[in-house]
Amino acid sequence: MYSNHNLNSDDCCFDWNEEKAAELQRTGVSFDRSLTPQSLRTSTRRLSEENKQQSGTMHIDTSPSVVSDIISSRRDRSQDFFGPHSSSPIAPSERQRADQRSRLESMRLTRRRDKMTKVRGGLEKMEEMIMQGEHLREMQRLKQEAQKNALPSDMAEYMEWQNNEDLEDDELLAFIEKQETYKNELEHFLNNANKNVYENNSYPNSHT
């Protein structure tokens, strides 16, 4: 059976039971493991401090402080000025994106209109060239037809003389017809005049 005594480095004897009792006294526990009044006071003080800390934490969580109000107001002002914090500070706003889309759409329409104008101008030039070509071909065809159907020079002179003869004959016939007309009118006038003279002469004789 071992002894409760031992030697220190300086060959002094010490008692293990006394050392353990002193350690237990420092921790507030008796030698037989029961609580002492000192240990109860220590435990009570520790529990009260923990309760205060918990109640302080609950109070901070449930009621906003002045600091949290300041932080919240600054956050609201910054969101109103710079936009939500979730977006990048260099990202464009919705209005800027709408303006960019509008400018891009306007540029696309202008480019498309210019392209259509160029195409239309090319088509108009092509149509004009085609019409000029058709006109030249038609003139060439008419010229060839005229040369093909052209009369010889002697035939043309004969036809011109014949036309002149026909014109002279027509003029002679017209003169003869006018002469006959004048002759008939003169005879009719003379007959009417003689008739009037006869009637005038017979009228006084009937009264006598």
Swiss-Prot record:
GO terms for biological process: double-strand break repair via break-induced replication; double-strand break repair via homologous recombination; heterochromatin formation; protein import into nucleus; telomere maintenance; transposable element silencing; transposition. Residues 94-105 have a biased composition (Basic and acidic residues). The keyword Chloroplast does not apply. Residues 28-105 are annotated as: Disordered. Residues 60-71 have a biased composition (Low complexity). It is found in: Cytoplasm; Nucleus. Keywords: Cytoplasm, Nucleus, Transposition. Residues 33-42 have a biased composition (Polar residues). One of its GO terms (cellular component) is nucleus. Involved in regulation of Ty1 transposition. Inhibits Ty1 transposition at a post-transcriptional and pre-integrational stage of the Ty1 retrotransposition cycle. Present with 259 molecules/cell in log phase SD medium. This is Regulator of Ty1 transposition protein 105. It comes from Saccharomyces cerevisiae (strain ATCC 204508 / S288c).
